[in-house]
Amino acid sequence: MWSNDHTERFPWQVPVAEGGTKEFAHLPYAVLHYVVVSNELNSPKILTCPQDPNRIRTNVWDAPLHVSLSYFAGLNADETNPDTILAGDRNVSTSSSTVTGLLTVQNARDLQATKDIHKTFVHVALVDGSAAQLNPADLRKAAAVEMKALTNQPMRLVIP
């Protein structure tokens, strides 16, 4: 949707002057990347996972979305690599605790699902339009596939 209108690029790949968030991709604010696609979404309610106990669901766009957002943005997502992760539940980390901000994963084996939302799994949306529920082993496999597709670059996620 949004990427179709921006030459197959996602917000973090498009300069601010063209309606994207590229200059902010290094910042720890996932909400910035979702706000720019708000015209493509019917309601901000879909930005909150119903099972996320630490987020407040809202029906209005002028509410503070940082307290509602349940999903990370996958900064490596790229239309030319359909196996890259576009978004997912925020309960991913390289430790046993949920983190916020920019998470850089150097080794796929370090990525794990925390127990804060879905106990032992994470929902992800891939660039190819598919979605998956991944257990920790499958999450690490998906990360390894993404990192290999991107010539072994670290995986970068902005977690709300």
Please name every model-derived segment.
Residues 1-31, 43-46, 131, 135, ...:
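Conserved hydrophobic/amphipathic alpha-helical signal-anchor segments
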